[in-house]
Amino acid sequence: MSLFGTTSGFGTSGTSMFGSTTTDNHNPMKDIEVTSSPDDSIGCLSFSPPTLPGNFLIAGSWANDVRCWEVQDSGQTIPKAQQMHTGPVLDVCWSDDGSKVFTASCDKTAKMWDLNSNQAIQIAQHDAPVKTIHWIKAPNYSCVMTGSWDKTLKFWDTRSSNPMMVLQLPERCYCADVIYPMAVVATAERGLIVYQLENQPSEFRRIESPLKHQHRCVAIFKDKQNKPTGFALGSIEGRVAIHYINPPNPAKDNFTFKCHRSNGTNTSAPQDIYAVNGIAFHPVHGTLATVGSDGRFSFWDKDARTKLKTSEQLDQPISACCFNHNGNIFAYASSYDWSKGHEFYNPQKKNYIFLRNAAEELKPRNKK
């Protein structure tokens, strides 16, 4: 299928400029709605790399599809193409040149989608759903890394049907991130492993989790020299850990903070605690965004250890987020995240992807 979303009405009125849409409880921040959003929960978002002119957004959903939009400078979105898996799509990523998109699915496969030809081919196979997918571009090799609930991490040359390497994980892969030459994988039972990717991928260190509850999302951050130096890890218990790989003072430099919590509705539960569904670092400022089951996004300055902004509450969870390559656009998905089980799923409820102008709100506190 080469195109989707041919309806002309949704998302085209009043969305020509950032922040000019009308507001209600599904969009209290008055952000731009992406046209023709997926028909089921949105599990992952990814913007195109800087090598591609313009901005293109990819979303994977529980409707088994992957969609691509062009995001114009005005903020308006144009549906471009769509591909299908035979199970929910759990993760997506881009090749460094922007010509390919890689997709991971509950159907136990990963695919490579050539955007120029609009053809998708299977490039990976696991014995259980594939939870994470990342493109690795090293000086001496390039490959796709897939993490699965079959407790393996596999590395694939896209020209071969067999993995170039298989690494065993202590448990099911729940989340991962890659910024060369570093990868981090968080697993079930609070497993946490850092890999180095130079020459060939290898395990660098196993880390005792700084969080007491199930890992949900992880994102690597860079130092002032633009090198990966640590990661932020989010859990189902409304908490994020900031962890440096080789900090000068571990007890002082590594810390956790509470987020995505609200005052409880009764005295026996003084606080409602929600899952952190996504973490994304601003590519210019190094500040970060978190999104949660509480239906809010928050912006943070980890160096000043302060909150920069919290959104109004949406009428359903925020399930995923990402920044575009220059940090001007913050994309976030509003859809059910299954954190309360299937009985709270309402198939009549629409799913949304919103775009927000992020240029000013994520500047660190000490920079005016």
From Swiss-Prot:
GO terms for biological process: cell division; regulation of mitotic spindle organization; RNA export from nucleus; transcription-dependent tethering of RNA polymerase II gene DNA at nuclear periphery. It is found in: Cytoplasm; Nucleus; Cytoplasm, Cytoskeleton, Spindle pole. Its main location: cytoplasm. It comes from the Eukaryota. The modification Phosphothreonine is found at T229. One of its GO terms (cellular component) is mitotic spindle pole. It holds the Pfam family WD40. The keyword Signal does not apply. The keyword Transport applies. Coiled coil: none annotated. Residues 15-34 are annotated as: Disordered. Keywords: Cell cycle, Cell division, Cytoplasm, Cytoskeleton, Mitosis, Nucleus, Phosphoprotein, Repeat, Transport, WD repeat. InterPro entries: G-protein_beta_WD-40_rep, WD40/YVTN_repeat-like_dom_sf, WD40_repeat_CS, WD40_repeat_dom_sf, WD40_rpt. WD repeats lie at residues 37-79, 84-114, 125-157, 168-206, 215-255, 271-301, 310-346. One of its GO terms (molecular function) is RNA binding. Belongs to the WD repeat rae1 family. Interacts with NUMA1 (via N-terminal end of the coiled-coil domain); this interaction promotes spindle formation in mitosis. Interacts with NUP98. Interacts with MYCBP2. Interacts with USP11. Plays a role in mitotic bipolar spindle formation. Binds mRNA. May function in nucleocytoplasmic transport and in directly or indirectly attaching cytoplasmic mRNPs to the cytoskeleton. This is mRNA export factor.
